């Protein structure tokens, strides 16, 4: 027993996968561009390099997430030319977000259509985003309804951190 009924995984800006152990569903972004996304961090670094001076000049200090123990974080706007792998994957997206039945197709070679399972997994993905305090812009990026108005941007852009 894994102790969970589902899990999500993905790359910044690219497809996000949700699985319940039987099915996998890859949700692709509504658009390839990530100009509306931001990096939220306490350690301003990409996986393989620090943020550039240009990136940091545009950073703002924003309100904490649920999991940062009241500590505000930097929001660094996404720049198109940073080479994030997720956006390259999004550019190669299939016509539809693929759904795979791991029981019949463990190698995930043949996508299937099952509207009921897809709707359930989309709902599960939404619940994970809510549970992990994802910013509203992330919901919009994946075509999901944010729990708060997008203009609030998770109440971070308009809230001044003292």
List each language-model region with its residue ranges.
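Short, solvent-exposed polar/charged micro-motifs at secondary-structure junctions
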Residues: 1-2, 15-21, 146-151
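WW-domain-binding short linear motifs
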Residues: 3-8, 115, 120, 139, ...
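C-terminal, low-complexity/hydrophilic appendages and adjacent surface loops
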Residues: 12-113, 156-161
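Short, solvent-exposed turn/loop segments enriched in Gly/Ser/Thr/Pro and often Arg
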Residues: 12-13, 132-148
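Short amphipathic alpha-helical coiled-coil/interface segments
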Residues: 121-125
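A short, highly charged, low-complexity intrinsically disordered segment
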Residues: 143-162
């Amino acid at each position: 027993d894994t102790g969970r009924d589902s899990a999500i995984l993905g790359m910044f800006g690219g497809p996000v996968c949700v699985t319940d152990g039987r099915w996998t569903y890859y949700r692709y972004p509504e658009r390839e561009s990530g100009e509306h996304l931001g990096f939220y961090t306490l350690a301003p670094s990409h996986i393989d390099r620090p943020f550039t001076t240009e990136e940091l000049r545009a950073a703002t200090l924003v309100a904490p997430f649920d999991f940062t123990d009241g500590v505000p974080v930097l929001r660094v706007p996404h720049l198109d030319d940073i080479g994030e792998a997720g956006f390259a994957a999004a550019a190669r997206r299939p016509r539809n977000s693929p759904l795979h039945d791991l029981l019949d197709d463990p190698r995930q070679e043949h996508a299937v259509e099952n509207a009921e399972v897809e709707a359930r997994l989309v709902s599960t993905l939404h619940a994970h985003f809510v549970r992990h305090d994802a910013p509203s812009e992330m919901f919009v990026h994946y075509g999901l309804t944010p729990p708060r108005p997008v203009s609030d941007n998770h109440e971070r852009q308009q809230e001044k951190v003292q």
